[in-house]
Each structure stands twice: as structure tokens, then as C-alpha cells.
A protein has these predicted regions:
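Glycine-centered tight-turn and secondary-structure capping sites
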Residues: 53-57
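RNA-contacting regions in translation and RNA-metabolism proteins
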Residues: 1-49, 62, 66-84
Length: 84
């Protein structure tokens, strides 16, 4: 069972990623500061990489858009990197 997303953008991205992929135990999230923005790195199983990126990058773009909206609510900048 997937737990509801918490108020942090990191937890929200993890929640969405686990809902999309098949190998939920292989979803890894890392977060670090890079200058004036917080970078969230998302790593999934190689077989699920296509699901996270989506056709023509639509899913990845949607994840970044959601992250941007959450960041503007918190007055912070966030970036999403998908690790291959």
C-alpha cells in the first residue's frame, strides 16, 4: 500500500513515482542544495525508466511542473533530475 504524499515536495515526488512504476522497492530519492535551488534526484529500475519519462517526456515534464508549483507555494526553487 502506498502512503499518501506528505507536505514535502520530496515525499510528493516519491509518492507519485511509486504509483507509476512496477518495482516500487527500487525507487530512490536524493535531495541536495545547488546554489539557490534544491535538486531532487529520482532513480528507478531500468525497466521502469520509460514509465517515469513517458512518451516524448510528458510524465517527466508533468513531474517537474508539479514540483515547480509546490516550490512556488513554499517560496523555493526545485529541480528534478531523473537518473538513468
Amino acid at each position: 500500500m502506498i502512503e499518501p504524499a506528505a507536505s514535502s515536495p520530496r515525499a510528493m515526488i516519491e509518492y507519485i513515482a511509486k504509483a507509476i512504476v512496477d518495482a516500487k522497492s527500487e525507487v530512490y530519492i536524493d535531495e541536495y542544495e545547488d546554489g539557490n535551488e534544491t535538486v531532487i534526484e529520482l532513480e528507478v529500475a531500468e525497466a521502469d525508466l520509460g514509465k517515469i519519462i513517458g512518451r516524448s517526456g510528458r510524465v517527466a515534464r508533468a513531474l517537474r511542473h508539479i514540483l515547480s508549483a509546490a516550490g512556488s507555494k513554499l517560496n523555493k526553487r526545485y529541480a528534478l533530475e531523473i537518473i538513468e
